[in-house]
Curated annotation (Swiss-Prot):
It is found in: Mitochondrion inner membrane. The lineage of its organism: Eukaryota, Metazoa, Chordata, Craniata, Vertebrata. It catalyses: a ubiquinone + NADH + 5 H(+)(in) = a ubiquinol + NAD(+) + 4 H(+)(out). Its EC number is 7.1.1.2. The keyword Amino-acid biosynthesis does not apply. This is NADH-ubiquinone oxidoreductase chain 6. One of its GO terms (cellular component) is mitochondrion. Keywords: Electron transport, Membrane, Mitochondrion, Mitochondrion inner membrane, NAD, Respiratory chain, Translocase, Transmembrane, Transmembrane helix, Transport, Ubiquinone. Core subunit of respiratory chain NADH dehydrogenase (Complex I) which is composed of 45 different subunits. GO terms for biological process: mitochondrial electron transport, NADH to ubiquinone; mitochondrial respiratory chain complex I assembly. It holds the Pfam family Oxidored_q3. It is a multi-pass membrane protein. The gene is mt-nd6.
Amino acid sequence: MIYMVSVSMMVLVLGLVAVASNPSPFYAALGLVLAAGAGCLVIVSFGSSFLSIVLFLIYLGGMLVVFAYSAARAKPYPEAWGSWSVVFYVLVYLIGVLVWYLFLGGVEVDGMNKSSELGSYVMRGDWVGVALMYSCWWVIIVYWWVSIIINFVCGIWVNSKSMWWESSCV
């Protein structure tokens, strides 16, 4: 079980690196599906299979909408995985993850159960995660304010741009 969680975490990081380093939405969608699947495997390993399936279906629906929009706005001949800029970004991100893991010690979340095989924790991981989320109430308020500001700024930015059909008229 510990090996499954470790491999799923590595696949999750590789999927996120694939999304962050690729300029083309066609290939980045593959990284998103990989990251979503690996994240849901991590959730399943903590004992919450129903939550994992629901999150995976919701996430795939959201990715479908975003992929359809970004594929419509993409260049007709996108850069592939082998182009030098993509390889450079992949190496930079992987070196950053490696440096973060080696020098900062990785991630340790207090209160979460590491595995059901260890036997030292009796609470399920999803309930402890909810308790940890609500124990830092100020973080939720900060996230709420940031989301309101982002929605306000994006709304002003979208309204200030001309629509694509207005500029293509002859």
